[in-house]
A protein has these predicted regions:
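C-terminal helical/coil "lid" or tail adjacent to the Rossmann-like core of SAM-dependent
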Residues: 2-11, 15, 194-213
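Class I SAM-dependent methyltransferase SAM/SAH-binding core
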Residues: 5, 42-44, 50-100, 125
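Conserved alpha-helix/loop element of class I SAM-dependent methyltransferases that forms part
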Residues: 23-39, 56, 60
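Helix-to-beta-strand junctions that scaffold the AdoMet/dcAdoMet cofactor pocket
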Residues: 38, 62, 120-121, 134-136
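A short acidic, Gly/Pro-enriched loop at the edge of an enzyme's catalytic core
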Residues: 99-110
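A short SAM/SAH-binding and catalytic strip from SAM-dependent methyltransferases
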Residues: 109-122
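A short glycine-rich, Lys/Arg-flanked "PGG" loop and its adjoining helix->strand segment in the class I
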Residues: 124-139
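Conserved catalytic/acceptor-binding region of the Class I
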Residues: 141-209
């Protein structure tokens, strides 16, 4: 279901997209969060996609419960299969919109979202919702992309054009492809007062990763 607050998910769920998303792990996408994970902690994983990061988080907090949500039921089926493959029993799934979660206040020790806010029409509203469902003393953990920060060498006109077109398409669809640089401002606007900004990157430099990219 969509409304005036919804953005179009620019990436879609073609197998080529899912293949890239399956490469993601908690170690390469949420390393900043790992030291804070404890057995028994409850986790809300927002925009879980195919579930690889979800599975890593669930293994770290087991037997603590993990609720993995996504706006798209089809990709939740993919995530469910991933969790079954890992024989994890502490994960449940639900469809939900991060801008209106429909969950009780103070429900989770950790609320996590990786590369979600770039696709959301109202990221501040989404952050307010994340804050609402996080328990006092808990952690809202956000990491997001910043496409304007992409660099490559040698410069290739085709990649320059791709980046320009992607950013235009993402914004036309209601998203913000340079969400990363805006996270601090959004969090402040959403009412967070204890904020620890950090950054990370992916480096595609080996023959394997260059071929994949």
């Amino acid at each position: 279901m969509t409304d005036e607050r919804s953005a179009i998910y620019t990436h879609g769920h073609h197998e080529s997209v899912l293949r890239g998303h399956r490469r993601r792990t908690a170690e390469d996408s949420a390393a900043y969060l790992l030291p804070h994970l404890k057995p028994g902690s409850s986790v809300l994983d927002i925009g879980c996609g195919p579930g690889t990061i979800t599975g890593d988080l669930a293994a770290q907090v087991a037997p603590g419960p993990v609720l993995a949500i996504d706006q798209f039921a089809d990709v939740l089926n993919v995530a469910h299969a991933e969790i079954q493959r890992r024989n994890l029993s502490n994960v449940t799934f639900a469809t939900a919109d991060v801008q209106s979660l429909g969950l009780r206040d103070d429900s989770f020790d950790i609320v996590h979202a990786h590369q979600v806010l770039q696709h959301v029409a109202d990221p501040v509203r989404a952050l307010v919702e994340m804050k609402r469902v996080c328990r006092p003393g808990g952690i809202v953990a956000i990491r997001d992309a910043d496409y304007a920060g992409f660099i490559w060498f040698p410069r290739l006109p085709a990649l320059d054009l791709w980046l320009e077109l992607y950013e235009r398409a993402a914004r036309a669809n209601g998203g913000e492809p340079d969400a990363g640089r805006r996270l601090l401002s959004w969090a402040q606007e959403a009412g967070f007062d204890e904020i620890t900004p950090t950054g990370s990157l992916w480096c595609y430099a080996t023959p394997e990763t260059r071929e994949w990219w």
